[in-house]
């Protein structure tokens, strides 16, 4: 009889830069959408959200909203999140780090 091994949960950190022309309600909706993508995750935690001046211009933007989140997941969850962030036009940049 085969025993199935459980996939280990891995800690990740998402740093996401959102366009500065969005209001607080739109930012909240974007964060909720990301949390919905991560619903399979064991843990999702919003660590911070700030507006900062960028070190260099990205497109026409000189500042942006930084969002930092932590979550536990594995490959399929991370790929699903990356796919969502790549097609999302409200985000400028993102980085997913394994902790």
From Swiss-Prot:
Its main location: plastid. Keywords: Chloroplast, Plastid, Ribonucleoprotein, Ribosomal protein, RNA-binding, rRNA-binding. The keyword S-adenosyl-L-methionine does not apply. Coiled coil: none annotated. One of its GO terms (biological process) is translation. GO terms for molecular function: small ribosomal subunit rRNA binding; structural constituent of ribosome. InterPro entries: Ribosomal_bS6, Ribosomal_bS6_sf, Ribosomal_S6_plastid/chlpt, Transl_elong_EF1B/ribsomal_bS6. One of its GO terms (cellular component) is chloroplast. CDD domains: bS6. SUPFAM superfamilies: Ribosomal protein S6. It is found in: Plastid, Chloroplast. The keyword Mitochondrion does not apply. Signal peptide: none annotated. Binds together with bS18 to 16S ribosomal RNA. Belongs to the bacterial ribosomal protein bS6 family. This is Small ribosomal subunit protein bS6c.
């Amino acid at each position: 009889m085969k025993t199935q091994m459980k996939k280990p949960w891995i800690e990740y950190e998402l740093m996401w830069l959102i366009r500065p022309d969005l209001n607080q309600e739109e930012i909240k909706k974007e964060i909720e959408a990301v949390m919905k993508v991560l619903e399979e995750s064991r843990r999702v935690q919003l660590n911070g959200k700030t507006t900062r001046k960028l070190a260099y211009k990205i497109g026409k933007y000189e500042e942006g909203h930084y969002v930092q989140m932590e979550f536990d997941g594995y490959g399929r969850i991370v790929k699903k999140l990356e796919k969502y962030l790549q097609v999302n036009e409200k985000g400028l940049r993102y980085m997913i780090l394994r902790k």
